[in-house]
């Protein structure tokens, strides 16, 4: 197995197309501004259409409802040109994962109908459930671009349905698909690769259906690029791709020039590894020097035995997401150009750059701590562009059951409260910034699953950290188990270490998961697996976000509104803000 985790990486884009950079740039300079505007916006629209096609065509609730998927367009060398705004965690890694594929099989060897596929955490990928598929786009016999998608697959085998919190290594987490080239007509579409995948998963209808959704989304991207090439010509299309990346680079470099040079440090920690109570610290040193920014994770804790390890691609993605959210405006497209001024480094064998075969299924938890550590560092230099610590955890809940008709696997990523910010309160009960999944409607779970029912879902008062701008509220989601032998597996965080406040703001609430059984309450660990019985009531209580600024500076009208809406109880308002009912 190829080990792609590296001690450091320079995140730069390669040349675009077979023309030299100078030739493409010359065409870009001569490109009509109106044509450029139309083509560049069309590229972004195509990526979004691909994302919509993927979500609407999928079979599993984790993609169809939660939208745990992404789509992007690439130039011929695998540089991201445009990407759908679905999962930020996928933003930075898709080009790195693509390049792992072309290292195994150069794109010159591809034929129409071929595709690359990869989910190997030690071959450029993230965790096994995120499967990346890249399809070449041929025009006039030449590859001019690629369409790429990634979907989180509901089940890819492994030791437990949905997720395996006690996996000893990456092999126990599911089927590994190394960076490879296949033919759709020969190897998929009823061929040997499709049959191999179907034979290794518990819910083949949903899993194979989601693979077909990825191929369908890639086909949409291919068709739309062919239309653009036919209308504007290949040279203009390639030039617009190049200029779109250059535009993002110019805008980001300008933003960096406005920030004082220096080294800024931040750290955060995962609660524990599920085996002991030692917190898992992630440290980030952010260096800004002119038009460049570097992040070094030296000093972060060693890799662990459980699945909390964060592979290199995930660390890079979390870092890029933090930088983009704090230092750029939303109108700057994310693409390879944005990445050019950035470097990321992390020592081998650490939590954020583990060695094979460390398990990585829950890599989102340390990835969030990378995100938080970078934002804490940047808070020292751009305090008006960051938010306090939020729920910032993947509350992954997998409830499965094996019945006479096979497995039923429910997987959901539940949200919590955002941290308060410099201008407003944190958002209530939403997924965290890196993940950005939507909730699964109760009606959808009622239709899809017969081994449980959702019997409660709502906001948790008094969970947002106090501050001038309070943290967002956490949520509760309550399940009634209907059948004996249901399997519950989870990984979550913020159970021991609360979301931090910034600039005098208070911490948010803790997370907890409980089972009510026969009149008693069983408290689960943050990383756990248990067998459930009919009649059990399982409840997640997610954490609220930290507050921003001192609570004494909160406007009285906002406090009164919080009390009126039930977001903050009168007792908590009196204790935390000095509020009285007659104010």
Question: Can you say where each PLM-predicted feature lies in the sequence?
Answer:
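Glycine/proline-enriched, intrinsically flexible loops and inter-domain linkers
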Residues: 3-4, 15-112, 117-139, 143-582
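Low-complexity, intrinsically disordered or signal/transmembrane-proximal segments
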Residues: 2, 7-10
